């Protein structure tokens, strides 16, 4: 598969058009760092319609803007990279319309550094859902005709086990507590990526991480 075929298949012109007209319903599939299993490469894509140029920089290319330049289609800059692993760090080096160079993290990143570190991170994993029983139960239950009592919480301050918050570890205890207290639903404060723990998630820096 040559480069033009890669572009047509993994940065489809129709999807770019839908995004630019505000009609894309699955923009996260078009943008960001996505692993393309068929070609064993990661595709990077970022929307920067007014940029003069964009390049991918990361720990895999020495953070050198000259090594991985990106190409443009309809305001979206993209490139394909082989051999990356989960945890590789990256950013976009953008030359703006006025010639200023800025380094930006990926707004569609699936994984990000935290605290004072601001690089995006490559993610090649996947999650296998095993909630078939619950989904069937939910489909059969008329939530509009059932009592509802919602428990809102911030996971990091509800209980923090040694080593930090662990969703899998905290789930059984949280479910038991809410059941005993008579709650029917749990509402979690923001879980998207944010830089400052004290904000309880209200300073979002990445909706997909």
Regions found by a protein language model. Give the residues of each.
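Ligand-site clamp/hinge motif
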Residues: 163-173
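Short proline/glycine-enriched turn/loop motifs at strand-loop junctions of beta-rich domains
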Residues: 47-54, 63, 85
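Short amphipathic alpha-helices and their capping/turn segments at secondary-structure boundaries
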Residues: 138-140, 171-182
């Amino acid at each position: 598969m040559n480069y033009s075929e890669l572009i047509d298949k993994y940065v489809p012109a129709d999807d770019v058009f839908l995004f630019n007209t505000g009609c894309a319903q699955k923009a996260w599939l078009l943008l960001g760092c996505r692993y393309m299993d068929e070609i064993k490469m990661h595709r990077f894509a970022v929307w920067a319609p007014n940029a003069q140029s964009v390049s991918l920089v990361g720990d895999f290319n020495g953070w050198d803007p000259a090594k991985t330049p990106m190409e443009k289609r309809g305001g979206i800059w993209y490139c394909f990279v082989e051999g990356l692993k989960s945890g590789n760090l990256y950013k976009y080096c953008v030359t703006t319309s006025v010639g200023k160079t800025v380094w930006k993290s990926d707004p569609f990143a699936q994984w990000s550094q935290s605290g004072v570190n601001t690089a995006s991170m490559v993610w090649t994993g996947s999650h296998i859902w095993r909630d078939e029983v619950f989904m069937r139960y939910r489909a059969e239950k008329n939530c509009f005709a059932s009592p509802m009592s919602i428990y809102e919480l911030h996971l990091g301050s509800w209980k923090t086990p040694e080593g930090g918050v662990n969703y899998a570890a905290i789930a059984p205890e949280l479910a038991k507590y809410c059941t005993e207290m008579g709650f029917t639903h749990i509402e979690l404060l923001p879980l998207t990526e944010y830089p400052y723990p004290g904000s309880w998630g209200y300073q979002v820096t990445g909706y997909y991480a």
